[in-house]
């Protein structure tokens, strides 16, 4: 469960290390984002000579949340951290690699490029 002012780790090699959530996209009164949702973020920490710089405003898709996520079969899944992948306006990842597992719910939200780059889909 991601809301405004949440700090996110970055799960790709775009060069950003920490993201600060500015807005949850999907309606003016929407408060929370879960796995597969898009948020607008500011880059809080970045590596030098990277594709994104500190202070850039970027869009990111949530790939892991610490809040447990219910599945239709009754099972739950949760991760150790809140992580996102920086995306462009075409909803494709800016980086070329994804680090760590991602949730299966991204497949239903049509983020196939992230699914194919991820080392593990849970």
UniProtKB/Swiss-Prot annotation:
The keyword Magnesium appears for this protein: no
Biological processes, Gene Ontology terms: translation
Keyword set, alphabetical order: Ribonucleoprotein, Ribosomal protein, RNA-binding, rRNA-binding
Matches recorded under Gene3D superfamilies: Ribosomal protein L14
Coiled coil: none
GO cellular component: cytosolic large ribosomal subunit
Gene Ontology MF terms in the entry: large ribosomal subunit rRNA binding; structural constituent of ribosome
Matches recorded under NCBIfam families: rplN_bact
Protein's job: Binds to 23S rRNA. Forms part of two intersubunit bridges in the 70S ribosome.
Assembly, per entry: Part of the 50S ribosomal subunit. Forms a cluster with proteins L3 and L19. In the 70S ribosome, L14 and L19 interact and together make contacts with the 16S rRNA in bridges B5 and B8.
Family, per entry: Belongs to the universal ribosomal protein uL14 family.
The protein's name in its UniProt record: Large ribosomal subunit protein uL14
Organism annotation: Trichlorobacter lovleyi (strain ATCC BAA-1151 / DSM 17278 / SZ)
Lineage summary: Bacteria, Pseudomonadati, Thermodesulfobacteriota, Desulfuromonadia, Geobacterales
Name of the gene: rplN
């Amino acid at each position: 469960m991601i809301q405004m002012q949440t700090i996110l780790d970055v799960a790709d090699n775009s060069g950003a290390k920490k993201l600060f959530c500015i807005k949850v996209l999907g309606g003016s009164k929407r408060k929370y984002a879960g796995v597969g949702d898009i948020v607008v973020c500011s880059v809080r920490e970045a590596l030098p000579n990277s594709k994104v710089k500190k202070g850039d405003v970027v869009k990111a898709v949530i790939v892991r949340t610490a809040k447990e996520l219910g599945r239709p079969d009754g099972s739950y899944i949760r991760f150790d951290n809140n992580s996102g992948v920086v995306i462009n306006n075409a909803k494709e990842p800016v980086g070329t690699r994804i680090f760590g597992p991602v949730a299966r719910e991204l497949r239903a939200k049509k983020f196939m490029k992230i699914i194919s780059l991820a080392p593990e889909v849970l």
